[in-house]
Swiss-Prot record:
Catalytic activity entry: (6R)-5,10-methylene-5,6,7,8-tetrahydrofolate + NADP(+) = (6R)-5,10-methenyltetrahydrofolate + NADPH; (6R)-5,10-methenyltetrahydrofolate + H2O = (6R)-10-formyltetrahydrofolate + H(+)
E.C. no: 1.5.1.5, 3.5.4.9
GO CC annotations on file: cytosol
Gene Ontology biological process terms in this record: L-histidine biosynthetic process; methionine biosynthetic process; purine nucleotide biosynthetic process; tetrahydrofolate interconversion
Function: Catalyzes the oxidation of 5,10-methylenetetrahydrofolate to 5,10-methenyltetrahydrofolate and then the hydrolysis of 5,10-methenyltetrahydrofolate to 10-formyltetrahydrofolate.
Residues engaged in binding NADP(+): G165, R166, S167, S190, I231
Name of the protein in its database record: Bifunctional protein FolD 1
One term of GO molecular function: methylenetetrahydrofolate dehydrogenase (NADP+) activity
Encoding gene (name): folD1
Disulfide-bonded cysteines: none
Pathway: One-carbon metabolism; tetrahydrofolate interconversion
Family matches, as HAMAP family: THF_DHG_CYH
Hydrolase is among the record's keywords: yes
SUPFAM superfamilies in the cross-refs: Aminoacid dehydrogenase-like, N-terminal domain, NAD(P)-binding Rossmann-fold domains
Source species: Desulfitobacterium hafniense (strain Y51)
Amino acid sequence: MTQILNAKPVVQAMKENLRQEVAALQAEGKAPTLGIIRVGSRPDDVYYENNIIKNCETIGIATKTYPLDLNISMEEFTAVMTQVNDDPSVHGIMLFRPLPPQLDEEVIKHLISADKDIDCMSPLNLEKVFEGDMSGLLPCTPAAVMAILRHYEIELKGANAVVMGRSLVVGKPLSMMLLQDNATVTICHSRTRNLPEVAKNADIVIAAMGRARMIDDNYVAENSIVIDVGINDAGDGKICGDVDYDAVVDKVKAITPVPGGVGSVTTTILLNNLVRACKSQ
């Protein structure tokens, strides 16, 4: 019978640990605080911001919000970012993206303080991951995948893992994390030849291609452990992953659902990064 790798127990365990860590920091006189910078008022950004604030409240983390006008200039934005960087009461920064065209995201990646960069935008934090140093602030989605694998005690040492997707946000850093835990990693993408066959021969299949229900039963075997990173519009008002869940669920060893899988853990990783950042400041 297929094991469903639900996020709920992973999140519950992480939040309980975070509550204890936050309480310990508060006892030392530190109040872990998240600074949230939002440009404009896109409904999905506002919804996610409110969700993050609620999650922070449940574990004792304070928040400061910086809602900015959609037409803010690069000069004005830089002044706000510098202010938040230099504010000792703010320990981590969350910046909503994508940004409007007048704001240069490549410049902003270098502008954000690496010590407060809990969403791992800064090249300095990504560089650590690629050097095999996992002690700093980690990219949230790859770290969420690793948290699920560890919670369910899925053995990585010597395992063959196929990562489908080569983005700098998920595929590449996740591959480095898997390598650090002694998995043998193959990175695949849209130009990979015989992709279904490559995936079917893996112990762990991680789908991060950004294509709705692309992975069907041709890509998996009965011993496959499938991690679905995708969050796509299913076209019926619902979301779906990169994996065709209904076609695959009864034909694999284990699988993460969408929703209720990787995405649900990602926000908790963000807060874990905040606590890490607070401890180091």
